[in-house]
Amino acid sequence: METTNFGFIASLLFVGVPTIFLIGLFISTQDGEKSSFFSDSSKGKLGPKR
C-alpha cells in the first residue's frame, strides 16, 4: 500500500511539475510577443536579467 502510494505521488510530481512549468512559460510568452518565443526563452526568461 505505502510503496504504491509513494510511487503514485512521485510519478504525479514528476509529470505535474514540468507540465505546470511549461504552461506557465507558455502563458508568460503569450503575454509578450508571440514571434519571439525562442529568443525570449533562450535569453532572459529562465534566468534573472543582469
UniProtKB/Swiss-Prot annotation:
Recorded superkingdom: Bacteria
Protein keywords: Membrane, Photosynthesis, Photosystem II, Reaction center, Thylakoid, Transmembrane, Transmembrane helix
SUPFAM superfamilies: Photosystem II reaction center protein M, PsbM
Intracellular or extracellular location(s): Cellular thylakoid membrane
InterPro entries assigned: PSII_PsbM, PSII_PsbM_sf
Ranges annotated as spanning the membrane: 7-27
Primary location class: membrane
One GO cellular component, as annotated: plasma membrane-derived thylakoid membrane
Role noted for this protein: One of the components of the core complex of photosystem II (PSII). PSII is a light-driven water:plastoquinone oxidoreductase that uses light energy to abstract electrons from H(2)O, generating O(2) and a proton gradient subsequently used for ATP formation. It consists of a core antenna complex that captures photons, and an electron transfer chain that converts photonic excitation into a charge separation. This subunit is found at the monomer-monomer interface.
Subunit text: PSII is composed of 1 copy each of membrane proteins PsbA, PsbB, PsbC, PsbD, PsbE, PsbF, PsbH, PsbI, PsbJ, PsbK, PsbL, PsbM, PsbT, PsbX, PsbY, Psb30/Ycf12, peripheral proteins PsbO, CyanoQ (PsbQ), PsbU, PsbV and a large number of cofactors. It forms dimeric complexes.
Name of protein: Photosystem II reaction center protein M
Organism: Prochlorococcus marinus (strain MIT 9312)
